[in-house]
Amino acid sequence: MFSQRFQRLVVISNHAKIRMVERGVSAEMLLEVIDSGDARYKDATHLWAFKAFPERYDNLLCAVLVLEDRVVVKTVMHHFLVL
């Protein structure tokens, strides 16, 4: 998987893969969150990318990302709220 937004390969942690299965998030949806979702940065390399999918009932989907030489997906959340 490759992120056009960050121009890097995407690596999904085992934890994030488990959460994706539990929450019914496909690789395609995850890439859409990463590439076209809104972003909030904690610092230069840590961020939350999030996006609403109208067909889903669980509010925003969010991917917790670390930007290294690749985009590392640490976890995937649903029912995400932006404060």
Model-derived regions: residue spans:
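Ribonuclease/tRNase effector modules and their secretory precursors
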Residues: 1-83
